[in-house]
């Protein structure tokens, strides 16, 4: 589209220069850029393009800000703050915040992004300082802004510091239920589950009823520890407190039980969920299909897909189809898997991804169906605009070497390198051995040069 070609044009010019100022000058000097009408959409797309390249992002941001008839929205400033913070350019981020403040553009969203980036860069004291200076941004210290700070600290593993700050603030800022849920999450993240339980009691002391999120956070902690007796205790407590677990809680437990090889127990819990009147959703059924497939209960998984989901009025998503395709391929039903792929292609809402195709590619390599392999790769790239990642290239190169298709494998190897995807040592080594066996000495030399 025209919009996309404008993005590509500016992006190409924005890569010239070693500093934001140089990039700004190179864009300002470009006659072709003078005719571009800058819009919010264009700026958003450019910032997204340069989310990992702060110099180009800031150069483009400054250039757009100087264009006649255009003024940055607060959202564009927030994106820029986030990019600078993510790339640990804290001085530049502070300067931008000061500029925003002069123009009265700082919102709580801005503050949240800046706090998170300060904490992520190990500067949690700066996040606290930002909260202390909220008044200078024309913002209030209230439960919402306090929660932002506490959440930021807890997510960076600073729950003790968050607690000390909360004890200082709670005399003049009233906490809400979310405040306590933040701490429950923070204590669990720090492996201090007793404190999380204690926070449940503290919550009740403040006249807040623990909700599904409060309990589910602790349940997730116990699931990760494979402490399922505690999980069941909490499920009983939730029901006794009139706060029944929801489908997300059940799905989490079921997945962890299956991962711990407790498949039967996981399936029993699905029955408990249904008996409790808890309605299944798409992620629940996706997990169930995956678990049944892994347990070798092929027909039951097919029944869930073909009968249970439609009967429950639950729609399928990409993940549902991906699980089914992987399972069908694993059991050698490639034609059925292909018909599901075609069904996805003709049904509107589905966005196919790499996971849709990889089991099929693997099956082609296993059965030696090179025509189908070629067609699938063609569909991936041309029909669905999907690109292969390092593991997909490795799968193909290894498989093609085993299938005696060295020339094709080497072609993919070259394609991979041209895209700046660095192959693993094993991939290079295997390809090298195979081409030597075929007396492809020129090719072998090129691979050896690359491996140096």
Where are these regions (language model features)?
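The canonical alpha-helical register within tetratricopeptide repeats
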Residues: 63, 99, 133, 168, ...
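Inter-helix linker motif
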Residues: 68-69, 103-104, 122, 138, ...
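C-terminal interaction modules of eukaryotic adaptor/scaffold proteins
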Residues: 402-452
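N-terminal targeting peptides
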Residues: 1-144, 156-161, 178, 192, ...
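Alpha-helical solenoid repeat scaffolds, predominantly canonical TPR units
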Residues: 60, 96, 130, 165, ...
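Pentatricopeptide repeat
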Residues: 39-43, 73, 77, 93, ...
């Amino acid at each position: 589209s025209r919009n996309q070609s404008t993005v590509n044009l500016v992006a190409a010019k924005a890569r010239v220069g070693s500093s934001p100022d140089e990039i700004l000058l190179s864009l300002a000097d470009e006659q072709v850029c003078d005719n571009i009408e800058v819009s919010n959409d264009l700026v958003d797309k450019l910032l997204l393009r340069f989310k990992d390249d702060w110099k180009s992002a800031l150069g483009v941001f400054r250039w757009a800000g100087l264009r006649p008839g255009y003024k940055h929205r607060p959202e564009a400033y927030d994106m820029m703050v986030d990019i600078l913070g993510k790339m640990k350019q804290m001085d530049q981020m502070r300067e931008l915040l000061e500029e925003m403040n002069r123009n009265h553009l700082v919102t709580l969203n801005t503050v949240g992004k800046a706090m998170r980036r300060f904490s992520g860069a190990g500067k949690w004291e700066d996040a606290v300082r930002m909260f202390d200076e909220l008044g200078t941004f024309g913002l209030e210290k209230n439960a919402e802004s306090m929660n932002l700070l506490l959440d930021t600290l807890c997510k960076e593993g600073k729950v003790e510091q968050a607690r000390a700050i909360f004890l200082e603030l709670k005399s003049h800022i009233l906490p809400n239920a979310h405040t306590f849920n933040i701490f429950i999450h923070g204590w669990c993240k720090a492996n201090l589950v007793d404190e999380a339980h204690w926070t449940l009691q503290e919550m009740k002391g403040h006249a807040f009823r623990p909700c599904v999120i409060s309990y589910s956070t602790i349940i997730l902690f116990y699931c990760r520890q494979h402490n399922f007796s505690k999980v069941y205790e909490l499920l009983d407590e939730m029901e006794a407190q009139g706060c029944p677990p929801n489908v997300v809680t059940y799905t989490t437990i079921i997945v962890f039980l299956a991962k711990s090889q407790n498949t039967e127990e996981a399936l029993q819990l699905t029955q408990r969920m249904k008996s409790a009147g808890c309605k299944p959703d798409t992620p629940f059924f996706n997990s169930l299909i995956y678990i049944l497939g892994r347990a070798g209960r092929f027909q039951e998984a097919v029944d869930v897909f073909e009968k249970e989901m439609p009967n429950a009025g639950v729609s399928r998503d990409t993940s549902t189809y991906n699980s089914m395709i992987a399972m069908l391929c694993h059991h050698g039903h490639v034609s059925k898997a292909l018909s599901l792929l075609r069904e996805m292609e003709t049904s509107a809402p589905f966005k196919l991804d790499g996971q849709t195709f990889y089991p099929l590619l693997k099956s082609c390599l296993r059965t030696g169906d090179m025509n189908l392999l070629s067609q699938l790769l063609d569909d991936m790239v041309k029909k669905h605009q999907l690109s292969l990642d390092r593991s997909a290239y490795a799968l193909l190169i290894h498989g093609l070497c085993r299938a005696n298709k060295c020339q094709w494998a080497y072609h993919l190897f070259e394609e991979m390198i041209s895209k700046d995807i660095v192959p693993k040592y094993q991939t290079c080594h295997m390809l090298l051995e195979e081409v030597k066996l075929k007396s492809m000495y020129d090719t072998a030399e090129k691979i050896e040069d690359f491996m140096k």
